[in-house]
Curated annotation (Swiss-Prot):
Lineage, opening ranks: Bacteria, Pseudomonadati, Pseudomonadota, Gammaproteobacteria, Alteromonadales
Protein name per Swiss-Prot or TrEMBL: ATP-dependent protease ATPase subunit HslU
HAMAP family in the record: HslU
Residues that, per the record, bind ATP: 18, 60-65, 254, 319, 391
Family per record: Belongs to the ClpX chaperone family. HslU subfamily.
Record keyword Methyltransferase present: no
């Protein structure tokens, strides 16, 4: 789990996301509170529940990007899902409980990787011994062999193996056969039976090992993975993963505004209000059955986000509003923000295009005036047509670089300076003509 302070988290987010300080501070505090809670006495810790967050802001201002970057910083089970993918229980489609099952799967994978990393040194030693056994098989009548000579030969080969002299030599080894997954579609409420059937089919079709002929360098990697997997206790692994999900799990619910009820409509609203009602117990705290065991959701942090252009937060059912107590509003982006987005973040758009053209031997230079004009053009198109936020910059940049990209392979050694004049020549007509902007940019 991440031990970063809120200030450090915001600093990391600043490297990728421009502006939106309120949203960054809220998620940073929420993430830090996960760590603070774990420092409390068990009795008090159980009573401290997470304060869920609702992020509100127009499309393309950084809501989803905050989630992506937070996932890397959290060092905890994290899942990002779109609320629109789910339907009410009893109808065709995914149930909201699948969110917790997917979160648990990611926690199991994360815990397995951590445990395999811990026992990697021991696994490397065992893999080395298995390769030496394949290179120097013991004779059948080994009762009369000279143990001293055998040990000396083994040490010579061990030295060669470690120095990489045997990397290209081929050997035959037994490696663990991959498990064949069986996907079973079952009606709602039958998940427990489905999990048991999947386990049964996996065990039936499971072959313990498979003989392969590999180069030693490839065989070594495969054997290290196999030996590390053998050293991991599967029961302990599942227990730790479930504990990790229950105490530190984070769910990011994107597009929550799309499941708001709009106006008066008759008939069942299976993918809107029905989904909201199904989300209530998850957010409030319930127990979900997964193939790894029962998972309690009482202390899982939920961060919801939505543009709320066609609806408003008050259109959510009151019970769900009450379970998202922290509201954060993200600001619409200005031309000045666009200029910063083009230059300041790590691996900014301009840096990416310069690096891509460098692979063809073409040098690209963006001047200050050129960057300002690109930002203005993107902002103008957003104002005149649909406002899609920073995503408009991708469209504008692709259109601007189209000609250079097409001819780059034939113009190795050339240099292009992208200034205000170049931008005007290539984009002015499209920006000024609203019909062209609507269809091309």
């Amino acid at each position: 789990m991440s031990e970063m302070t809120p200030r450090e988290i915001v600093h990391e987010l600043d490297a990728h996301i421009i502006g939106q300080q309120n949203a960054k501070r809220s998620v940073a505090v929420a993430l830090r509170n996960r760590w603070r809670r774990m420092q409390l006495e068990p009795e008090l810790r159980h009573e401290v529940t997470p304060k869920n967050i609702l992020m509100i802001g127009p499309t393309g201002v950084g809501k989803t990007e905050i989630a992506r970057r937070l996932a890397k910083l959290a060092n905890a089970p994290f899942i990002k899902v779109e609320a629109t993918k789910f339907t009410e229980v009893g109808y065709v489609g995914k149930e909201v409980e699948q969110i917790i099952r997917d979160l648990t799967d990611s926690a199991v994978k994360m815990t397995r990787e951590q445990q395999m990393k811990k026992c990697r040194h021991r696994a490397e030693e065992m893999a080395e011994e298995r390769i030496l056994d394949a290179l120097l098989p013991k004779p059948k009548d080994d009762w009369d062999t000279d143990q001293k000579d055998d040990s000396t030969t083994r040490q010579v080969f061990r030295k060669k193996l470690r120095e990489g002299q045997l990397d290209d030599k081929e050997i035959e080894i037994d490696v663990a056969a991959p498990q064949v997954g069986v996907e079973i579609m079952a009606p709602p409420g039958m998940e427990e039976m489905t999990n048991q059937l999947q386990g049964l089919f996996q065990n039936l079709g499971q072959s313990t090992s498979k003989r392969k002929k590999l180069k030693i360098k490839d065989a070594y990697k495969q054997l290290v993975e196999d030996e590390a997997a053998k050293l991991v206790n599967q029961e302990d692994l599942k227990e730790q993963a479930i504990e990790l999900v229950e105490q530190n799990g984070i769910v990011f619910l994107d597009e929550i505004d799309k499941i708001c009820k709009r106006g008066e409509s008759s008939g069942p609203d299976v993918s809107r209000e029905g989904v909201q009602r199904d989300l209530l117990p998850l957010v409030e705290g319930c127990t979900v059955s997964t193939k790894h065991g029962m998972v309690k959701t009482d202390h899982i942090l939920f961060i919801a986000s939505g543009a709320f252009q066609m609806s408003k937060p008050s259109d959510l059912i009151p019970e769900l509003q009450g379970r998202l107590p922290i509201r954060v509003e993200l600001d619409a982006l200005t031309a000045a923000d666009f200029k910063r987005i083009l230059t300041e973040p790590f691996a900014s758009l301009t840096e990416q295009h310069v690096a891509l053209m460098n692979t063809e031997g073409v040098t690209i230079e963006f001047t200050e005036s050129g960057i300002e004009r690109i930002a203005e053009a993107a902002w103008q198109v957003n104002e005149r047509t649909e406002n899609i936020g920073a995503r408009r910059l991708h469209t504008v940049m692709e259109k601007l670089m189209e000609e250079i990209s097409y001819d780059a392979s034939e113009k190795s050694g050339s240099k292009f300076v992208i200034d205000a004049e170049y931008v005007n020549d290539h984009l002015d007509t499209l920006v000024q003509d609203e019909d062209l902007s609507r269809f091309i940019l």
